[in-house]
């Protein structure tokens, strides 16, 4: 999911869109290095991939808020590349004892992507200009002034990661009024 398509994230998006009837889905990989070995999938495998308890929310967001959300997400994860030698991901060097290593600047569970829309990310552009939403996944036009139903987890829907507050510009005290449905069971 950090470098391109991810079957797991595609699966999460598909489930969220199907279960909610939403127009757009937001989801994060949640873990950078989790893996499932070949063979039967167990409940514990799923918990290693999706370890946090969350409900599934459906919220009302405008097209402009969706774009702002994605701008914030990708600004937290992608460098503004000025040359082919620059890292795509926003990384920082750290030292642990005698060892040097590189890690993400931000938590992996705050890197959301979207489904239900066709969009591009230009990593040579600054925050606010990285995201271009071309159209809805069904080919219909995307309208920044229209209100869309968006599926996302409750951590994000309650303001976690600040993608809705700082990114979309929705005041924290308004988030609850944007929720149009919540599951009564944990997503896992």
Functional labels for PLM-detected ranges:
Residues 1-188:
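Catalytic centers of hydrolytic enzymes
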